[in-house]
Amino acid sequence: MDIQQQKFWNILLVGDSCEDIYHYGVCDRMSPEAPVPVFRELRQEVRQGMSSNVKLNLKSFGMKVEHVHNSEKIRKHRFIEEKYNQQLFRYDQGEEKKVYPLLPRMSRGYDAVVVSDYNKGFVTPETFEFLKDQLPPGMPVFVDSKKQDLTCFKDCIIKINESEAHKAIIDPTQEVVVTLGASGARWKDSIYKTEKVDVFDVCGAGDVFLASLVYGYLKHGDMSKAINIANKCASLSVTKMGTYVLTTEDINDLCI
């Protein structure tokens, strides 16, 4: 079915937000001051990252999104040698600034809540508890968090990658989807394999997976189908350079 014909869902998205700034250039000489190359910038691209990337991907599926995030975004600068498509280094701005999470009184018009927590201080256990207290019983809450202790996200659908899952403290009763990179994803005792692709850039793939998982779950009400959809979308995103946002054409071509 064409994405334009599908139902629109209302989503509340809460999380840390950033700008991914890509500096493309060339290194064609060495510095006379130190044994390092001189980077000559040719062009620059700015993309929305972290929870802002989740938002854009949710909107690609036709969802209406209310986004609550840090007012002053973190900025991640990546310097890329364009000829070889090689990232030279990255520096970040704004992580050290204290943030004050403020959540408005929530309406009951949401179909799901999504928490994209990069553990930069915006989503605290207290903030999440305040949020949960206002939600009607049974509303699905999806959480992707880089916190080590995830027990505060009780009664939520947690998405986490494999390396983080090994270190995380998770309640055995929690529902957890573990992404396995090229091997797909694990939910309960099942492995959901994904097709092999040429990986170009994994930046933002987890955000695409999360947004697609939410879409698949709301559309089908079935976690297995949702994971298969998320696998397809994440596999597509890693074939693209930089933080990627699914297009309507992508979604229609994937027949999801």
Spans of features found by a protein language model:
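Conserved N-terminal subdomain of the carbohydrate kinase-like
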Residues: 2, 8-14, 19-114, 245-256
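Active-site metal-binding loops of divalent metal-dependent hydrolases
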Residues: 16-17, 118, 208
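Short helix/loop capping segments that flank catalytic or ligand/cofactor-binding pockets
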Residues: 21-23, 123, 168
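Short internal beta-strands
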Residues: 68-69, 141-145, 159-160
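Non-cysteine beta-strand/loop elements that form the S-adenosyl-L-methionine
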Residues: 80, 155-163
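Conserved phosphate-binding/catalytic region of the ribokinase-like
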Residues: 95, 109, 126-155, 166-256
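Active-site donor-nucleotide binding/catalytic segment of nucleotide-sugar enzymes
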Residues: 114-121
